[in-house]
Structure formats: C-alpha cells, structure tokens
Curated annotation (Swiss-Prot):
This is Sodium/calcium exchanger 3. It comes from Mus musculus. Calcium transport is stimulated by cytoplasmic Ca(2+) and is inhibited by Na(+). Isoform 1 is more sensitive to stimulation by Ca(2+) than isoform 2. Isoform 2 is more sensitive to inactivation by Na(+). Glycans are attached at residues 45, 824. The gene is Slc8a3. Ca(2+) 1 binds at residues 409, 445, 471, 475. It holds the Pfam family Na_Ca_ex_C. Residues 31-73, 169, 223-230, 749-755, 801-829, 883-904 are extracellular.
C-alpha cells in the first residue's frame, strides 16, 4: 500500500508540527510571565507552568546535569524525540504479535453435539468467542494496550500517586480516534462511494457507553468527591466494563427488548454474521438495514437463494474468465486457488487483521494475504449449503449439490450430482431429470438428456452426465438448466399376516424435492484464434549459453493459421554481433499449433557483464485462413455501409475471436556473467516465504520471518497472489526495524497454548516498552518545559494512535462496511476509561484506603479535557448519524464536497480540543 510507505515520514512531520505548536504556546507563556501578567486568578505559577526539573522515571533515570546549556538541551530534545518515535515503532511491532495471538484466541472453535427431535445427533463446530465480545475485550485491549498499561504503570510506579500522563493520554487518544481517524476514513473513500456501519445497534450501544464513560469520569472528579477518588468510584468504573460488554452482546444477539423489534435479517449460523435482506430505502435514516418509521407492508419479495445463486454464478464466471485471460497457461486447480485469493482479498476482514497488515507492510514484512491463499482455497470450496427446515422426520430431501456448474466447451461432458438427505436411506429412491434450454440450445451446444437417477439403499448421492458439443464457432458463454422431478421411493410388498390397519399406522418412507432442484450449467467457450505471449516478461541468461531458445505460446484457442511478427530491440546490450545477433521475422502458427521457438545467438566475449539487457517484442498477429464472411465483416470497407442487426452481432463476435497479444508481448533478456537453472526453485521458495500468516507455528519460522525482506504493495496490484520484488522503502524499513523484529521473534509462537502464551508474553513486553515511553515522554516534556498533561494529549496519544489510523484507513478502503474502520473506535474509547483509568485508580484507591488515607486526583485539567471531549463527541456522532440519510448514503465517503466538509469539521474539532486543553493547562483560560 503506497500510503503505508509515508507513515514514518508523516508521523515525523506531524510530530514536528505539534512540537512547533506547543513551543509557540510556551513562548507566549514565557512572554506573559516576563511581563508580570497572571494568566488566571486563583492559580499559582507552579500549576500553570511546565516544570523544567525532570523527575526520576519508572525505569529511566534523570539525565544529569539537570540544568544543561541551550545546546545540550536541544540535543537532549532530539534524542528524546527520536527515541520516542523508535519506541512507538517497537510497540507497533510487538502489538502485531499481540494482535496475532488475539486473532488465534478469538478464532478458536469447539465441537457441540446437537440432538434432533427424531433422536438423531450430529456434531458441529461453533466459535467460542462472540464477535462483539471479542471486539470489546481482547481486540480493544490489543489496540489500546499502551494507553491502558501506561495509566496503570504510572500510578503503580510512582508510589500510587495520581499522574497526568496516563489519564491525559487516554482522553487525548480518544479525541484522536474520534476526530482524526474517523475524519481520515471519511475522506479516503473514492468520490461517490459510501461505507456504512452494518451493526448499527451495537455501534449505538458502544457510542453511548463511550460518552457516558467520560461523563462518569467528570462526575467522580468534580461532583461526587471533588479531588478524591474513593474505592467505590474506582471499582464501579471498572465494573462498567463488563456491563458495557454485556449490553453490546445483548444488542448483537437481539435479546431482551430487541427480540420484540422487527427483524429484517437472515442469520448465517455458520459464519456468525448478520446479512441484510431488504434493499428498498425509503426516505429517512437507515438503522440496521431498516428505515425508521417504515413497515413491512407485503410479503412479496425475491427469494434470497435465487439471488445469491445467480450473483455467485456471475461472479465466479467473471473471476475465472479474467484469471484465465491473464494466465492462460494455468491449470484449473491453480485458477481455483487464484480465484480464492481474489475472493479473500475482497472479503470483509476484522480490525485486528488490518492492524497486523498495516504494521507488517510498513516494516517490510510483506502481504499476509498471500500466505492464506492456499488455505482459503480449500476452506471456501464448501460454502454452498442449504439451510432449510426439515419437512418431516421421515421425509428424504433430494436436490442438486452444488447447483451451479461450469465447464469448457471441449470438456466432452459435465457431471452433475444429486444428493438425498434425511429420511430412511435404506430404501431405493428414483428421481427423474431433464435438460432445458437457456441461452444454450440442445443439439447445438449440448446433448439433450433425460433419464432417471436411481439411489440404491445406503447411497446418498449419485452422478449423471450431460454431453457438451464442441464447435469451431467463437461465441459468448451460454448456459442451460437441468431440472429434477417425480421423486419417489420403492415401496416394499405387504408382509404376510400384516393387517392393513397396522400397515397404515407405520410411517412410510417418503421423499420430497428440496431447493435447489434446478441446476445451472454454464458453458465457457474456448473457440478462439489464440492469445500469443511469452512465458514471462523477464529472463536471465548466461553469456556462455551460445544460442538461446525463446518459446512463444499460443493459448486460449488454436483455430486457424496465424502469423506473428517479431524483432529484437537493443537496450544496454548491443546487437550486430557485439552482445547478441539481431533477429527478426515472422512466426507462422498452423491450425492447432500452440508453440513456436525463436533462436537468438548470444555472444560470449569473456567480459564481466551484469544486467546488460535487450528486448524481444511481438507485433500484432494476423489471420491467414479467415473465412470469407468473417473477412468481409472485419474489412475496412464494411464500415461504409450500415450493417444489419445480425451482421453487427456477427461482427462483434468475430472481433472477439481475433488473435491478440497476451500478458507478455515483450520479453526482456538480461545477460549475466553466469546462469543457473534455479528460477523455478526460487519462485517456489518465494511463494513459501510470502506465506506470511497471522499466526506462527515455530520459533524458527518467526526468526526466518524477522530477517526476511518481503514486498509490501497493494493487494489489488497482483490479484494472482504472486510475488513482486521488495522496493527500496521495504529494505529501508526492514533495516530500521530489524532489531525489534528479531527481538520479538523470541515471543512464543501463537500455536503454543492456543495463543495464550504469546498473549501473556506480548502484553508484558508492551508494558515494559510503555513504561519506557512514559519516562521518555515525561523527560521530553520537562526538557522543553511542557506539562505532562500537554505531552500526553499531544505526543503520546498521537504516537499510540498512528498504527490504528493506518489500519482504519486500509479497512475503510477495502471493506464494504464501516464497522472495521470506525465501528470499534467508540468501543475502544469506553474500554480505555473503564480498564485504563478504572483499574489504575481502583488499585491506588484500595492502597491508600488500606493506609487509612484518601487517593487524591487533581480535577482541573483532566476534568476540563473530559468535558471538552464529551461536547465534541456529541457533535461528531450527530454528524455521523445524519450522514446515514439516503442522499448521503453512509458514515464514510459520499460526494466530494460533503466529504471535505465532514473531514474539515472533525479535524477542526481535534485542533480545537488540543488548543483549548493546552490553553487551560497553562491557565490562559479558566478550567474547573
């Protein structure tokens, strides 16, 4: 991702701007102090000015001497600033491991046994963690661990005395998340596109708790017991965390009062997600796929199964055709794997994934999607499953599985599978089938077929074939249908001595047709004059090779005779016998001929030549034995007269069947001093090395990953999942971060203890780094005369939130919905208060209560920041809610003017928050 490459520079420039801003305020404060003006009555100079006397940190000692000269002070500021950025980078990398362990933990499944009403039992797997619960607990902890641990470490490390750094970082981080991250996500969506929150009820619950958390923080600071945090206040703050999680879970599961509300969702039990079922949007504000004040007036709607099957079929054909066009040499299994990679790269992902992806691509660790391509290809192959209620206990359901089939025109025949499910499988069952025309016609495109499938006792599925007719005419893809009918069960003869009454009381085995009972077969046409291409775009040869052979491939059809001109073009390697012999001419491909070879002599002059290159290029191919009708349709003279509709269609199809150049019309030949046949092995190794999974299996894998440079780049740059070379930026960032990557490779792999070992060790390391960051930030602030509250709000909050910013931006661009990009912002803000401040203050309040004293917390600056943030958060959430109206379409994106206005508003709110919080800290405006 190109924007990720600017992350360190962007972070540095923004930090520099913030430093300049705060130093400007310091100059104003110093000028006011020199003139004898008192900024605010009733407040002493010590509380209104930043102290230049640094205090001992939790880990870092004081840098002596304490009163350095101006030059030494500038040097110290630079050292502290660079160290802060480097420590933030280290926290991002260990947070990558931490989030990977959370992904492993939250994706765990367990087996459950389900007992059906008829007494049968079946075993299935379900996710242990609910998505909403994991987002508000482990996911929030993973993204906010530095802020939470900083608050706890600051209190415990300074003798259980309240500090400004931890709480101010939490409030400042909340402001940055709410205003800057959401503002960026609004802006980066392409003009005219929108993203909306899907689970709006959960978002409302977390947003309400987010605002309540900061209102509650103000109440315990300035209302209940001003300046003192009592034990019950700290414990109640901490107790609000599980209450928030519980209510969000209730909203997600639609329990309590939610179950009485109108449901317009279909729940996918297998994936645990909610899918909207209605697309009509009347005027108003949309909420969870339902318009407010709207009602379901009638029951006439298109069945979901039909829509999904049709859309899935079209999407599958489009992906396979595109991939086959780009990679005609690939076999079907490779195309399926590439298609699965494409689907994986475009599906909705968790916030943890984007956080890990952003960090790894920023640090030269590569694209983790390329690791999952093979595994996802297997997992996604069994996604078509019909969920219908059992008609009766003793009825067998008969249907196609799958219901969509694709085949090439020259395949000969296509196999279709009929499945029976449930009922008594000890009986023989019969079901008739018959082909029906679609855009494909029986006798011309396929063989008309009808017959009866016999499922013998114990058989649950049976295959039958339909012949496909191959012709020499290039035509568009066509489809036909196969319909099941007249399902029946072979009944046994009446047993001797059995009374009719007894026979009638027995539940006779019966069978019914279930959906889908109609299969769609799509014929992918392969009649084409051919696509002509080299095997690759670059080849390395040794100068001692003598005569090199270059293959020209003819793929995706081999109809007719085609001539392909070619020539060599000089680069740094010169022709005419200096480095190679010039070559030019024409290749003539006969009918059904698929490969031709170009021979070029390479001159061996015994010189050390590295990266000398030249190019072999093909020109436009032309048909030789074109039919008269096709030649007339494609001739220039035909444009002088108006064609009939039939001639226009025939001309269009003829144009599509013309020979064309493929993916590699040019071949760059690089002449080196030596050449070894290892390109295939290298590609295989690179593919293996690119398999960067979120989880790790061994320490060896982690250390290999830590010292390996892999290419970043956008997922859309290479839909096949194949490797490109690392850029200069990838190498630079790798060498800058290799210390952290090797150090954190010592963390236990995520496979150990189901991720919990990695979880515990990672959070301990994050805590240690956070303690160092707190000391660096405090020493940085005191060196330039900043208060801890200002340093926390401006610098620490910014540094801890930068990785989340880039992760949210990636999620906003790549996800269909806005949940992964901004849906978790409000939840994280609430968790920061309940865990970060609640835990730290509970520990401190209990400690001082055991000493018979009270835990004192200064309410001034923190209470003012909390109040200011709460007001601005109301404005932000109101704007987001208004943006769900139909003329805007969603929280993110929209028309360019609306995007700019929203982004500028949110950024302005953050700048105003920073300005007012800083002015209040230095007593330029009166706080509480």
């Amino acid at each position: 991702m190109a924007w990720l490459r600017l992350q360190p520079l962007t972070s540095a420039f923004l930090h520099f701007g913030l430093v300049t801003f705060v130093l400007f305020l310091n100059c104003l404060r110093a000028e006011a102090g020199d003139s004898g003006d008192v900024p605010s009555a009733g407040q002493n100079n010590e509380s209104c000015s930043g102290s230049s006397d640094c205090k001992e940190g939790v880990i870092l000692p004081i840098w002596y001497p304490e009163n350095p000269s101006l030059g030494d002070k500038i040097a110290r500021v630079i050292v502290y600033f660079v160290a802060l950025i480097y420590m933030f980078l280290g926290v991002s990398i260990i947070a990558d491991r931490f989030m990977a362990s959370i992904e492993v933990i939250t994706s765990q499944e367990r087996e459950v046994t389900i007992k059906k009403p008829n007494g049968e039992t079946s075993t299935t797997t379900i996710r242990v963690w609910n998505e909403t619960v994991s987002n508000l607990t482990l996911m929030a902890l993973g993204s906010s661990a530095p802020e939470i641990l900083l608050s706890l470490i600051e209190v415990c490390g300074h003798g259980f005395i309240a500090g400004d750094l931890g709480p101010s970082t939490i409030v400042g981080s909340a402001a940055f998340n709410m205003f800057i991250i959401i503002g960026i996500c609004v802006y980066v969506i392409p003009d005219g596109e929108t993203r909306k929150i899907k689970h709006l009820r959960v978002f409302f619950v977390t947003a309400a708790w987010s605002i309540f958390a900061y209102i509650w923080l103000y109440m315990i600071l300035a209302v209940f017991s001003p300046g003192v945090v009592q034990v019950w206040e700290g414990l109640l703050t901490l107790f609000f965390f599980p209450v928030c999680v519980l209510l969000a879970w209730v909203a997600d599961k639609r329990l309590l009062f939610y179950k009485y509300m109108h449901k317009k969702y279909r729940t996918d039990k297998h994936r645990g997600i909610i899918i909207e079922t209605e697309g009509d949007h009347p005027k108003g504000i949309e909420m969870d796929g339902k318009m407010m004040n709207s009602h379901f007036l009638d029951g006439n709607f298109t069945p979901l199964e039909g829509k999904e099957v049709d859309e899935s079929r079209r999407e599958m054909i489009r992906i396979l055709k595109d991939l086959k066009q780009k990679h005609p040499e690939k076999d079907l299994d490779q195309l399926v794997e590439m298609a699965n990679y494409y689907a994986l790269s475009h599906q909705q992902k968790s916030r943890a994934f984007y956080r890990i992806q952003a960090t790894r691509m920023m640090t030269g660790a590569g694209n983790i999607l390329k690791k999952h391509a093979a595994e996802q290809a297997k997992k996604t192959s069994s996604m078509s499953e019909v969920h219908t209620d059992e008609p009766e206990d003793f009825a067998s359901k008969v249907f196609f599985d799958p219901c969509s089939y694709q085949c090439l025109e020259n395949c000969g025949a296509v196999l279709l599978t009929v499945v029976r499910k449930g009922g008594d499988i000890s009986k023989t069952m019969y079901v008739d089938y018959k082909t029906e025309d679609g855009s494909a016609n029986a006798g011309a495109d396929y063989e008309f077929t009808e017959g009866t499938v016999v499922l013998k006792p114990g058989e649950t599925q049976k295959e039958f074939s339909v012949g496909i007719i191959d012709d020499d005419i290039f035509e568009e893809d066509e489809h036909f249908f196969v319909r099941l009918s007249n399902v029946r069960v072979e009944e046994e003869q009446l047993a001797e001595g059995m009374l009719p009454a007894i026979l009638n009381s027995l539940p006779l085995p019966r069978a019914v047709l279930a959906s889908p009972c109609v299969a769609t077969v799509t014929i992918l046409d392969d009649d084409h004059a051919g696509i002509f291409t080299f095997e690759c775009d670059t080849i390395h040869v040794s100068e001692s090779i003598g005569v090199m052979e270059v293959k020209v491939l003819r793929t995706s059809g081999a109809r007719g005779t085609v001539i392909v001109p070619f020539r060599t073009v000089e680069g740094t390697a010169k022709g005419g016998g200096e480095d190679f012999e010039d070559a030019y001419g024409e290749l003539e491909f006969k009918n059904d001929e698929t490969v031709k070879t170009i021979h070029i002599k390479v001159i061996d002059d015994k010189a050390y030549e590295k990266n000398k290159n030249y190019v072999i290029e093909m020109m436009g191919p032309r048909m030789v034995d074109m039919s008269v009708q096709k030649a007339l349709l494609l001739s220039p003279e035909v444009t002088d007269r108006k064609l009939t509709v039939e001639e226009e269609e025939a001309k269009r199809i003829a144009e599509m069947g013309k020979p064309v150049l493929g993916e590699h019309p040019k071949l760059e030949v690089i002449i080196e001093e030596s050449y070894e046949f290892k390109s295939t092995v290298d590609k295989l190794i690179k593919k293996t090395n690119l398999a960067l999974v979120v989880g790790t299996h061994s320490w060896r894998d982690q250390f290999m990953e830590a010292i390996t440079v892999s290419a970043g780049g956008d997922e859309d740059e290479d839909e096949s999942g194949e490797e490109r070379l690392p850029s200069c930026f990838d190498y630079v960032m790798h060498f800058l971060t290799v210390f952290w990557k090797v150090l954190f490779a010592c963390v236990p792999p995520t496979e150990y203890c189901h991720g919990w070992a990695c979880f515990v060790v990672s959070i301990l390391i994050i805590g240690m780094l956070t303690a160092i960051i707190g000391d660096l930030a405090s020493h940085f602030g005191c060196t330039i005369g900043l208060k801890d509250s200002v340093t926390a709000v401006v610098f620490v909050a910014f540094g801890t939130s930068v990785p989340d910013t880039f992760a949210s931006k990636a999620a906003a661009l790549q996800d269909v919905y806005a949940d992964a990009s901004i849906g978790n912002v409000t939840g994280s803000n609430a968790v920061n208060v309940f865990l970060g401040i609640g835990l730290a203050w509970s520990v401190a309040a209990i400690y001082w209560a055991m000493q018979g004293q009270e835990f004192h917390v200064s309410a001034g600056t923190l209470a003012f920041s909390v109040t200011l943030f709460t007001i601005f958060a109301f404005v932000c959430l109101s704007v987001l809610l208004y943006r769900r109206r139909p003329h805007l379409g969603g929280e993110l994106g929209g028309p360019r003017g609306c995007k700019l206005a929203t982004t500028w508003l949110f950024v302005s709110l953050w700048l105003l928050y920073i300005l007012f919080a800083t002015l209040e800290a230095y007593c330029y405006i009166k706080g509480f």
